[in-house]
């Protein structure tokens, strides 16, 4: 059933020891065998049970419910398991508060007090008048939901093992050395205390001194000395120690201190270990000071610069936002703008904010664009009339005069605004790894892309590639029309150059293109294609040019110019009578253009109306004389060719025809 007993015992050894002590305090003794059997059943039917164990009563109630469900399904649950489960649940009930949580400090204190009583009874039997006092101290949170079980093992489990005869070897005072004192700062050296009263034990256990290693989250760090006359952290109240005094007798930790926390906690701890006492002490806040003696009316009040730390939650949100959405996502831009305009950030603050949020490659880009923007701003300051006395060292927070925070805190508002604009501009130019910034000329609207999406992409690319705001606005307005698809261009064309002053050109373009590409627009285009009507209301029946007038939209036969000429000719010809007989047929008084006669007055056919005869075959001509074909056997009967031509020439109609040369030669 599940894992073997040896594995269960080794896995839950520390927790089993604690449960036995807890039950022993309540007057109940449970054998280790029965507890191992209980945890075997829990391991089988409750796989969610933590390896470190739990003191929460809700978890043990949940174990009971799941064991009941397993029993209803036919699984056999031994009776001893039910008894042990009920005993443990009853033992945990007194430790529950109104919030159903376990006060671990109370549990530890009560258990250690029981150990104290048992030890006192044993010591009184051997030596009289000797006793040992244990002082319990809360070292963890009040709720078991936030209990660090690693710390729980460090404090309790060695003591329980010692009570069972398997405790760790104790180190004498001469051999005890603070753990890690060679490489830890003063605020993190483990506390080593001597016992208040020496305990005479047997010869195998001489008087000892134990080390107490507080967790990293609870270690006390002295407030850093500030350069400005005020501490960076509030000092501890007078009359008590900055951290609760450790007990007079502590146990050697079985594991190194837990380093739980986010990356931000590690950065803060690292900066403090390196001696950076001013880490995370930003931004600067200006507070008016009360007027001093001799102050005149109307004199501006004196202002004192102070630091106020950002919350850890805000810095964590910045880091997670950059990691999930990217440094230039709409969420990150909005968050960064609110931070930049809501606080008085100096160059040191911008550098710390970028280091904590950006990756190394992104921070390198930010620093590069920051320096580039500073050089451009310095040129503008020098060219201004009058020149602005703000140099590059002040905008970068470097040099002899601006390298410290106290010097940067005295920067003028104009310099703070310039640093803000430069850093925001540099942040916008940060690119994600593997991505490139395209040219604004290559940003074109797709055939099915909404016009607002196209304009948003165009503005984003122009903002990254064009520094001057006026030039960027002109380029965006131009490319919003030139790079749009034909449908949006036809809708924008009537507005181009006619937008009234004071109105946003891009907003008017977006209004004009509203609905293009949708179902209504497609239906309208289909209806216009069927009826031959376009948006302008023109009729399109022919796409070519007229051969008469050269205009587009009609054929020559429908040309209005030609029809107008025909009407004019008819009006001019039919309005008067012909002066004489028809010059063509000579038979009537009508115009020659209106003559339809086929014969003239003499009966001769007129040209153009005579019927043509049958077409004749073309005559063959060549360099050789034509020899008629004569079949064999008829050559003697055929007369010579010369006689044939002589007979033909005697005919009256062929008297003038000369004989062929071949016939003459014969």
From Swiss-Prot:
Compositional bias segments (type: Pro residues): 232-247
Keyword vocabulary terms for this entry: Cell membrane, ERV, Lipoprotein, Membrane, Metal-binding, Myristate, Repeat, Transposable element, Zinc, Zinc-finger
SUPFAM superfamilies the record matches: Retroviral matrix proteins, Retrovirus capsid dimerization domain-like, Retrovirus capsid protein, N-terminal core domain, Retrovirus zinc finger-like domains
Compartment(s) where it occurs, according to its Swiss-Prot or TrEMBL record: Cell membrane
PTM field: Specific enzymatic cleavages may yield mature proteins. Myristoylation is essential for retroviral assembly. Alteration of the glycine residue leads to a block in the budding of particles and an accumulation of Gag inside the cell.
InterPro entries per record: B_retro_matrix (IPR003322), B_retro_matrix_sf (IPR038124), Gag_p24_C (IPR045345), Primate_lentivir_Gag_pol-like (IPR050195), Retrov_capsid_C (IPR008916), Retrov_capsid_N (IPR008919), Retrovr_matrix (IPR010999), Znf_CCHC (IPR001878)
Principal localisation: membrane
Lipid attachment locations (N-myristoyl glycine): 2
GO biological process, one term: viral process
Family matches, as Gene3D superfamilies: 1.10.1200.30, Human Immunodeficiency Virus Type 1 Capsid Protein (1.10.375.10), Retroviral GAG p10 protein (1.10.150.490), Zinc finger, CCHC-type (4.10.60.10)
Domain of life: Eukaryota
Topology of this chain in the membrane: Lipid-anchor
One Pfam family from the record: Gag_p24
Recorded GO CC terms: plasma membrane
Residue ranges, compositional bias (Polar residues): 604-622
Stretches the record annotates as Disordered: 165-205, 217-264, 598-641
MF terms in GO: nucleic acid binding; structural molecule activity; zinc ion binding
Positions annotated as zinc finger (CCHC-type): 544-561, 580-597
Family, as annotated: Belongs to the beta type-B retroviral Gag protein family. HERV class-II K(HML-2) gag subfamily.
Entry note about domains: HERV-K Gag polyprotein contains regions homologous to the matrix (MA), capsid (CA) and nucleocapsid (NC) proteins from infectious retroviruses. Evidence suggests that HERV-K(HML-2) Gag polyprotein can be cleaved into mature MA, CA and NC under certain circumstances. However, the exact boundaries as well as the size of processed Gag proteins have not been precisely determined yet.
Primary role: The products of the Gag polyproteins of infectious retroviruses perform highly complex orchestrated tasks during the assembly, budding, maturation, and infection stages of the viral replication cycle. During viral assembly, the proteins form membrane associations and self-associations that ultimately result in budding of an immature virion from the infected cell. Gag precursors also function during viral assembly to selectively bind and package two plus strands of genomic RNA. Endogenous Gag proteins may have kept, lost or modified their original function during evolution.
PANTHER family, sorted: ENDOGENOUS RETROVIRUS GROUP K MEMBER 24 GAG POLYPROTEIN-RELATED
Other facts noted in the record for this chain: This protein is synthesized as a Gag polypeptide and as a Gag-Pro-Pol polyprotein. The later is the precursor of the Pro and Pol proteins. It is thought, by similarity with type-B retroviruses, to be generated by -1 frameshifts occurring at the Gag-Pro and Pro-Pol genes boundaries.
Entry protein name: Endogenous retrovirus group K member 7 Gag polyprotein
């Amino acid at each position: 059933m599940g894992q073997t007993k040896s594995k269960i015992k080794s896995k839950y050894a520390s927790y089993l020891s604690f449960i036995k002590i807890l039950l022993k305090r309540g007057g109940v003794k449970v054998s280790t065998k029965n507890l191992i059997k209980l945890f075997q059943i829990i391991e089988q039917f409750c796989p969610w049970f933590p390896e470190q164990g739990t003191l929460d009563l809700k978890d043990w109630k949940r174990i009971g419910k799941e064991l009941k469900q397993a029993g209803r399904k036919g699984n056999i649950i031994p009776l001893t398991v039910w008894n042990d489960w009920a005993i443990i649940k009853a033992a945990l009930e007194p430790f529950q508060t109104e919030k159903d949580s376990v006060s671990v400090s109370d549990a530890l204190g009560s258990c250690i007090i029981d150990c104290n009583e048992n030890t006192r009874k044993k010591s009184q039997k051997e030596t009289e008048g000797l006793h040992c006092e244990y002082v319990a101290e809360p070292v963890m949170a009040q709720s078991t939901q936030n209990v660090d079980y690693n710390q729980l093992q460090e404090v309790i489990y060695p003591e329980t093992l010692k009570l069972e005869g398997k405790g760790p070897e104790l180190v004498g005072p001469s051999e005890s050395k603070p753990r890690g004192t060679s490489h830890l700062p003063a605020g993190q050296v483990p506390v080593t205390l001597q016992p208040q009263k020496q305990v005479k034990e047997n010869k195998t256990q001489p008087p000892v001194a134990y080390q107490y290693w507080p967790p990293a989250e609870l270690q006390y760090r002295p407030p850093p000395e500030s350069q400005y006359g005020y501490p960076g952290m509030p000092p501890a109240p007078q009359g008590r120690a900055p951290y609760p005094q450790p007990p007079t007798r502590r146990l050697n930790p079985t594991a190194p201190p837990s380093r739980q926390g986010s990356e931000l906690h590690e950065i803060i701890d690292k900066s403090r270990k390196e001696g950076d006492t001013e880490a995370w002490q930003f931004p600067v806040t200006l507070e008016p000071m009360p007027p001093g003696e001799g102050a005149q009316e109307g004199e501006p009040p004196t202002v004192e610069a102070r630091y106020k730390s950002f919350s850890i939650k805000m810095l964590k949100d910045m880091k997670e936002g950059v990691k999930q959405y990217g440094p230039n996502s709409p969420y990150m831009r909005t968050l960064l703008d609110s931070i930049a305009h809501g606080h008085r950030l100096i160059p040191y603050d911008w550098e710390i904010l970028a280091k904590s949020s950006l990756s190394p490659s992104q921070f390198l880009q930010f620093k590069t664009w920051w320096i580039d923007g500073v050089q451009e701003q310095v040129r503008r300051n020098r060219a201004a009339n009058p020149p602005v006395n703000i140099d590059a060292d002040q905008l970068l927070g470097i040099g002899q005069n601006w390298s410290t925070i106290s010097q940067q805190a005295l920067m003028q508002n104009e310099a703070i605004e310039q640093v803000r604009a430069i850093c925001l501009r540099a942040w916008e130019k940060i690119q994600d790894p593997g991505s490139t910034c395209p040219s604004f000329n290559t940003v074109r609207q797709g055939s099915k892309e909404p016009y607002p999406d196209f304009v948003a992409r165009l503005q984003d690319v122009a903002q990254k590639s064009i520094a001057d705001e006026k030039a960027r606005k002109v380029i965006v307005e131009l490319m919003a029309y030139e790079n749009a698809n034909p449908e949006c261009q036809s809708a924008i064309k009537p507005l181009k150059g006619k937008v009234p002053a004071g109105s946003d050109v891009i907003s008017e373009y977006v209004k004009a293109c509203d609905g293009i590409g949708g179902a209504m627009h497609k239906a309208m285009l289909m209806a216009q294609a069927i009826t031959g009507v376009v948006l302008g209301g023109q009729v399109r029946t022919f796409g070519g040019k007229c051969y008469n007038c050269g205009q587009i939209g009609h054929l020559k036969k429908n040309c209005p110019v030609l029809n107008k000429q025909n009407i004019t000719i008819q009006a001019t010809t039919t309005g008067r009578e012909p002066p004489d007989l028809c010059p063509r047929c000579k038979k009537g008084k009508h115009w020659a253009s209106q003559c339809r006669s086929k014969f003239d007055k003499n009966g001769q056919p007129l040209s153009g109306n005579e019927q043509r005869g049958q077409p004749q075959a073309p005559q063959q001509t060549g360099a050789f004389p034509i020899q008629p074909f004569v079949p064999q056997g008829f050559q003697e009967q055929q007369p010579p060719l010369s006689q044939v031509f002589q007979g033909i020439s005697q005919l009256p109609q062929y008297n003038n025809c000369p004989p062929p040369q071949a016939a003459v030669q014969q």
